[in-house]
Structure formats: C-alpha cells, structure tokens
C-alpha cells in the first residue's frame, strides 16, 4: 500500500539520508522469522545411541538377566521405591493447612485482647522461628529424602534405577511408556542382529572356502614344481647324450669304413659290436621312458595299452567314477606293459608312435595357445586378424623338409671326421695395405657352409635349450635370494627408463657440469677401460703421428719414410 502524499513529500524534503536496517527485509519469503516450538517437543531430545553402548548393553543382557529392563511409568516407579513416604504426604499437607488456619485465628484474637499487647518482642521472634521450622518440615514432607532404610526390595530398586530421571514431570507418563516400549523393541532387534552375525561367523563358511582355495593352489604349485623337476632331468639326459652325438659324428663314414675295418682287424670289430649293443640298449631305455611318461597321463594312456580313451571335455573335470577306475587301474598295474622290439623294428615303431601322438599334441598346443593369448591380451590389438594359429605356423615350418634336413646336416661345431681330409683354410693376411682403412674379418662362419649328409648336428637347438636353462636357473626368484631380487629390480628399472627418460632441462647450454663417476675398486683391481678403441687401433694411431708410418720394426723389415720435415722444425722421436 502506497504512503499518503504528505508523507511522501516530507520524505523528499528531509535532507537526512535514509539508513535502513539490514534486518528489516520487506520480502516476506526472505524475512527473518522466529519459529515457535511444537507442543510435543521437549528440551531434552533423545540422542542416538552409539554402537559401543549398544554392544555393551547386549553383552550385559547376555551376562545377567537382572539387567533386562521393562516399561513402566514414573508414578509406578515412585510407588515401588517409596510407597510409605508418598502415603504420608497427604497427611502432612492436611496438618499444614490446619496449622495455617489456627495461626490466623490466634492472630485475630491477639489483636482484640490486651494480653497480646503486653507480650515482649522476643515472643514474635519465637513465632517466626517456629514458622520457618514448620515450612522446612512441609518441604521435606512434599519431597521425602532418599534413604536405603525405606527400601526393602533391592532387586526392584536395581531394575528401576535406569529409568529414574528419564522424564521431568508426571505429565509425561504416557510418553515415557511409549519411549520405553520403542527402546525395548530396538534393543531386541539389535540383539537379534548381533546374534545372527555371531551365528554367521561361527558357521565357518568363509574359512572353509578359503581353505579349499588354498589347497587347490598348493596342489597346482606342487604339480608345476614336479613338471619343472622332470624337465630338468630330461635336459640333464639330453646334455649327457650330446657328448655321444659329437663322438658319433666323428666316426668313419661309409666310404672310409672298410679301410678302418681292414686295418683294425678283430679289435675294431669287437669295438663296433659293443658300440652297437650300447646304442641298442640306449634306444630301448628311451622307449621305456617314453612309455612310462605317456602311461601316467590319462590323455595319452591309450597310446601305450592300446585301449581307446573317452573324449575329454574342454574343462577337463573328471568324474568321481573315472577317478576311482583310474585309481584301481593304477593299483593293479602301475607300470606300462613291456615291449620286446628288435633293433630293426625301432624306427618303424617310433614313426607310428609319433603319428598317433600328433593328435593329442595339436589339441594341447591349441588349447594352451588360446589361453595364453587371452591372458596376454593380444586379441585386443589391431593386427590380431593377421596372426596365425600355432598349428598353422608349425605346419608351415615343417613343409620345407629340405631346409630342415640341410640344417641338421650342417657342421656347426669344429671337429674332425675320421678318414676325411680337412679342407685348407684360407690364410689371413698378416699385413695390411697402406691405404686400407677396414680390417679384414676372419671367416668365422665358414664351417656353417660345410654340409655333410652323414652327420646329425643340432647344436643350435642344443644351445637354445642350455640358454633357457641357464636363464631360468639364474633368474629364479627366491624370496631369500637378494641377488636375484636385485637383478630383477635393475631389469625393471631399465625397462622403466626406456619407457620414459628423465631429462634435466636445466642442464643445457653448459649450465651443468657433465661427468661420469668412476666405479669403486673391487679387491684392489684397476678400473676397466670402456674405450671403444682396441690396442691395434691405438698402435696404428701412435705410429701415424707426425706424418710417419711404421709397419714393422727394424730396418731389415722395411721402413717407409714420410715426407721431409719442414726447415726449422723441432726434432721428434717415436
């Protein structure tokens, strides 16, 4: 509503500025207001109970039933605690009313008579003292003092002590009863919840699951450990047979064998016969080892005993009946059947065994190739479509049979075949021409071009096996092996440095001195010189100083003087 015109003119003519109170907000929505409390609200709001107190109350209830409470009212509590004192309260109030009425009558009578006027002032003071004493008695009667003498039933007192002082007046009896019932219900629910939790913990379901998982992992670890131990033993046998293979490659070949037999006589024939028996025995031992390994595996047992095995699923989870039958068969016959093979039948037997084993081999290779491929994450790369399966790669390599045979017939190590003349080696020139800047390299790979059809040399594959064995032995991470852990840490740091190099941007333009820290002396050993120049290059450098070149020592081996020194130059010596 707009103000009157006179008030508006007065405000315009008034030179005093209008200072409004920021608290006076004209808007009704944003003006500050005082909200009255509701009638059912109390000053003492019920605060939430913490988890510690809840657990403590539950433990007390489980320990002793005397701590269990019950819903009651303040009036009933007072009657239980001090019933006699409350019954005497009414009589005390009646006596106090009679005393007040009697004192008023005595005052009226004293004012009208002459006897009251003659009383001394001390009588008035005595009456006042008596009045104060009566008031004290009245207050004590209204609020009787608490004493253990008035309490006869201490169990009821202990049960009701928790509810004393929970409310302030007798008007809140109903509210206190409702709150008591709610608290009792909440405590009951909490108690049931705690019991359920304890029951779940006592069941031991999680403990049993973790033990099962641990036992499975332990069994897998033991199986892998046994496989590695078996592989090490096979490699050890392969290393021992390598010596025999090298000796066999040095034996006389068919073109020179009759000459050796003629010259050797009976002693040569007996040595050849004993050698053939040893080779035959070795072949039979290898066949027995192969049968033993194939017979222990359920997937390849049919290759030994001839019984067709059932097709296995991808998950390879044998049933209990299969395990029982396998256990019974293992108990009845723990070893594969013995074979009686002649020496001339062994090559055919090995070829047939390889053709039968190839199906199982391809299945295992394909399965583990897919598992490792998924685990390594190679499927997610962009060029995954161009990758071929492991079986396709093997077939592609085996297609070139001539190349594979030529690699096994290549002489890779240095040894001399008996009865065969060695080829003359190309001499390496001792002196170099004057204008030659590149030193000739020795023909170190010349023996790789020497192909002999009568030998079998697989040194490249043998060296690869040895390299893998040494790497696995040296990089086996033992928790107690600090050296291996240090090597692994250095390898990881090296890979990290390759990924992201740390560049000091403030070290450019000569703002930081560049230096290399010399390594510490180990057992008083001189530091190793990491210079790229060898001794021959240094010698050639020192000899070519000051325009002179000395190719040999002494005048008899030839001196090649350089150009004459300029006049006035200082003499020099080498």
Swiss-Prot record:
Q: Which InterPro entries match?
A: AATF, AATF/Bfr2, AATF_C
Q: Where is this region: Disordered?
A: 82-205, 302-340, 553-574
Please tell me where this protein is predominantly located. Answer: nucleus
* Residue ranges of the TM segments: none
Q: Where in the cell is it found?
A: Nucleus, Nucleolus
Q: Report the domain of life of the source organism.
A: Eukaryota
Where does this protein have compositionally biased stretches of type Basic and acidic residues? Answer: 187-198, 302-312, 322-331
One protein family per Pfam:
AATF-Che1
Work out whether the entry's keyword set contains Transmembrane helix.
no
Provide a GO CC annotation, any one.
nucleolus
Q: Which UniProt keywords apply?
A: Nucleus
Ranges of Acidic residues composition bias in the record: 86-97, 126-137, 168-186
Question: What family does this chain come from, according to its entry?
Answer: Belongs to the AATF family.
Q: List, alphabetically, the PANTHER family matched.
A: AATF PROTEIN APOPTOSIS ANTAGONIZING TRANSCRIPTION FACTOR (PTHR15565), PROTEIN AATF (PTHR15565:SF0)
Its job: Part of the small subunit (SSU) processome, first precursor of the small eukaryotic ribosomal subunit. During the assembly of the SSU processome in the nucleolus, many ribosome biogenesis factors, an RNA chaperone and ribosomal proteins associate with the nascent pre-rRNA and work in concert to generate RNA folding, modifications, rearrangements and cleavage as well as targeted degradation of pre-ribosomal RNA by the RNA exosome. May function as a general inhibitor of the histone deacetylase HDAC1.
Assembly and binders: Part of the small subunit (SSU) processome, composed of more than 70 proteins and the RNA chaperone small nucleolar RNA (snoRNA) U3.
Protein's recorded name: Protein AATF
Q: Which organism is it from?
A: Gallus gallus
- Please name the gene that encodes this protein: AATF
């Amino acid at each position: 509503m707009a103000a009157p015109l006179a008030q508006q003119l007065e405000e315009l003519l008034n030179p005093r500025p209008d200072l409004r109170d920021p608290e006076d907000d004209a808007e009704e929505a944003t003006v500050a207001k005082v909200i009255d409390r509701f009638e059912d609200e109390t000053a003492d709001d019920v605060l939430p109970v913490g988890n510690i107190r809840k657990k403590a109350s539950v433990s007390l209830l489980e320990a002793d039933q005397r701590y269990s409470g019950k819903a009651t009212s303040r009036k009933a509590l007072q009657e239980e605690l001090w019933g006699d004192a409350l019954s005497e309260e009414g009589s005390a109030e009646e006596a106090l009313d009679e005393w007040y009425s009697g004192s008023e009558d005595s005052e009226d009578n004293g004012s009208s008579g002459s006897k009251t006027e003659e009383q001394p002032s001390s009588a008035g003071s005595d009456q006042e003292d008596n009045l104060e004493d009566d008031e004290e008695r009245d207050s004590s009667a209204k609020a009787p003092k608490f004493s253990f003498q008035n309490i006869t039933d201490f169990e009821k007192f202990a049960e009701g002590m928790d509810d004393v002082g929970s409310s302030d007046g007798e008007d809140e009896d109903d509210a206190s009863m409702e709150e008591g019932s709610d608290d009792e219900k909440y405590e009951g629910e909490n108690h049931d919840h705690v019991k359920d939790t304890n029951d779940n913990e006592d069941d031991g379901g999680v403990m049993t699951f973790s033990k099962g998982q641990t036992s499975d992992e332990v069994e897998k670890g033991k199986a892998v450990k046994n496989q590695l131990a078996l592989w090490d033993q096979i490699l050890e046998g392969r290393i021992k047979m390598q010596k025999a293979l090298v000796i066999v490659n040095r034996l006389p070949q068919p073109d020179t064998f009759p000459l050796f037999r003629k010259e050797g006589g009976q002693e040569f024939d007996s040595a050849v016969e004993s050698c053939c028996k040893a080779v035959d025995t070795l072949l039979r031992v290898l066949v027995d080892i192969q049968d033993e390994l194939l017979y222990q595996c359920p997937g390849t047992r049919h290759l030994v005993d001839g019984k067709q095995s059932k097709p296995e699923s991808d998950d390879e989870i044998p049933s209990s009946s299969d395990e029982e039958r396998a256990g019974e068969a293992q108990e009845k016959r723990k070893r594969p059947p013995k074979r009686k093979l002649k020496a001339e039948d062994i090559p055919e037997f090995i070829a047939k065994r390889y053709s039968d084993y190839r199906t199982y081999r391809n299945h295992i290779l394909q399965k583990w190739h897919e598992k490792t491929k998924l685990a390594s994450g190679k499927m997610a790369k962009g060029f995954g479509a161009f990758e071929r399966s492991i079986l396709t790669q093997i077939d592609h390599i085996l297609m070139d049979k001539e190349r594979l045979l030529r690699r096994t017939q290549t002489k890779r190590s240095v040894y001399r075949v008996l009865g065969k003349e060695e080829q003359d080696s190309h001499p390496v020139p001792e002196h170099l021409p004057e204008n030659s800047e590149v030193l000739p390299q020795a023909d170190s790979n010349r023996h790789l071009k020497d192909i002999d059809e009568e030998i079998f040399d697989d040194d490249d594959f043998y060296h690869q096996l040895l390299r893998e064995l040494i790497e696995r032995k040296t990089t086996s991470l033992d928790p107690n092996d600090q050296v291996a852990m240090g090597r692994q840490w250095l390898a990881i740091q090296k890979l990290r440095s390759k990924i992201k190099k740390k560049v000091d941007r403030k070290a450019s333009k000569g703002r930081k001195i560049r230096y290399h820290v010399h390594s510490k002396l180990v057992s008083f050993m001189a530091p190793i010189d990491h210079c790229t120049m060898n001794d021959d290059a240094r010698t050639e450098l020192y000899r070519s100083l000051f325009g002179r070149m000395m190719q040999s020592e002494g005048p008899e081996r030839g001196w090649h003087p350089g150009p004459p020194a300029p006049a006035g130059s200082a003499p020099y010596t080498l």
